[in-house]
Amino acid sequence: MKKEEMILVVDTETAMINPTAKVSGCNSLVYDIGLAVANRKGEIAEKRNLVVNDIMFGEYKRMETCYYAEKLPQYYVEMGTGVRQIVSLETARRIVLELMEKYNIKKVAAYNMMFDYYALKKTNEFLGGKFEFFPEDTKYIDILKMARGVFKNNKRYSNYCYENNLLTENGNPSISAENVYRYITNNPDFVESHTGLKDVEIETEIMAYLNNRKCKLNRKIAFNY
């Protein structure tokens, strides 16, 4: 019997290196990593909630100006109670490699995968690391690209966005993770947590929903950087 394929879903929260520059993975330092090992149905086998101490505490000036700085008190409380595991970036990488080996994972997924990939890469470089965060042969799945493929010209989704004012600055239907999750759960009042683990859980649900809509995790979606 063929063993079920497992995927590592990742979400990062970041502080900007240069607060006045454009938001991008290459201008970001990762302080929070959410990890979920899941199958194509979105069933989670294992999850981790990691805080990168080198950035959270070592770059406190930048942390004060991060996009979701108002959530920092929540982090401090949860770190104190053990809900969040405080680690170095190198230890976070070791945990990722152990999970990938344990579940024979070859694919890593994220909503806007390029941002998370380059944010982790830039954080590693910033801290003087010489390693690649993920194994060299890893395939990457961008859940955002999957969502665009399913919802871009979907009249029902567009109508839902217009009815609930879930629009971009240009007035087009938004395909953010928050708004896609609002649609698939029919909960227009849902507010994304913008913390690593909580966000990775909803992104796993979105991935499963899209996969059920025949948006296959094929070579057009899974790619190398």
Short names for language-model regions:
Residues K2-T123:
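Conserved non-catalytic scaffold segment of RNase H-like nuclease domains
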Residues T12-M16, K145, I202:
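Short, glycine/acidic-enriched loop or turn micro-motifs at the edges of active sites
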Residues I17-P19, R148, E205:
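Conserved protein kinase catalytic core
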Residues M79-V83, G129-F134, N187-E192:
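Short, polar/flexible loop-turn hinges at active-site or ligand-entry regions and domain interfaces
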Residues K107-M114, Y118-A119, N159-Y225:
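Acidic, Mg2+-coordinating catalytic module of metal-dependent nucleases/exonucleases
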Residues M114-K139:
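Substrate-recognition/cap helix-loop segment adjacent to the acidic, metal-dependent catalytic center
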Residues F134-I141, M146, E192-V200:
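Short, surface-exposed recognition loops or helix-turn segments adjacent to catalytic cores
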Residues Y140-T168:
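Short alpha-helix plus adjacent loop in nuclease-associated cores
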